[in-house]
Design a protein with these regions (language model features):
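Short aromatic-glycine-enriched beta-strand elements
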Residues: 55-61
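A short macromolecule-binding patch
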Residues: 67-78
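Conserved beta-strand/loop element in small beta-rich adapter and peptidoglycan-binding domains
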Residues: 39-50
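N-terminal acidic leader/helix
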Residues: 82-89
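Secondary-structure transition/turn motif
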Residues: 8-9, 62-66
Length: 145
């Protein structure tokens, strides 16, 4: 799946809130009206490496210039909806996991879904091995598209 960035500010996410919020309130995306997604470039295309189902929203797992992050889907438009079903996996979080209930489920490459600590290693701890696996899988996916 490929997406194009339309927005990179928390203020833009206000359109998708369930109720009106003042600018300094944290909304369902974990962002205020002042939040900036500096890792995103408006108009740029991104290859989606996974979908993260947070408690109150969904996010794409993407990278920009080597910086891996999860960003709310509402910041993008889908430009290629094809998903590699042969190599993508799905996992529902167990309530005993540290990331539950904040993350409910993950859809993505094998290691992301089958290692219970993969999300933490990749996004929170930024472990080198987890990042290497991410980019290895990205290269494989780019060859298929």
């Amino acid at each position: 799946m490929k997406v194009r960035c339309l927005y990179n500010r928390g203020e833009d996410l206000r359109l998708f809130e369930y109720k009106p919020l003042i600018k300094d309130m944290i909304g369902r995306f974990g962002a205020t009206g002042y939040t900036e997604y500096n890792e995103l470039e408006i108009g740029k295309e991104y290859l989606v490496m996974g979908l993260i189902f947070f408690e109150t929203y969904q996010a794409y797992l993407i990278d920009d210039n080597g910086l891996i992050s999860t960003c709310p889907c509402q910041l993008f438009e889908i430009i290629d909806s094809r998903v590699n079903t042969a190599n993508w996996h799905f996992r529902i979080m167990d309530k005993t996991e540290n990331i539950y209930p904040f993350i409910q489920a993950i859809l993505g490459y094998y290691e992301l879904c089958n290692d219970k600590k993969a999300y933490e290693k990749l996004i929170i701890e930024k472990e080198e091995e987890a990042c290497q696996i991410y980019f290895k899988r990205k290269i494989e996916l780019e060859k298929e598209l």
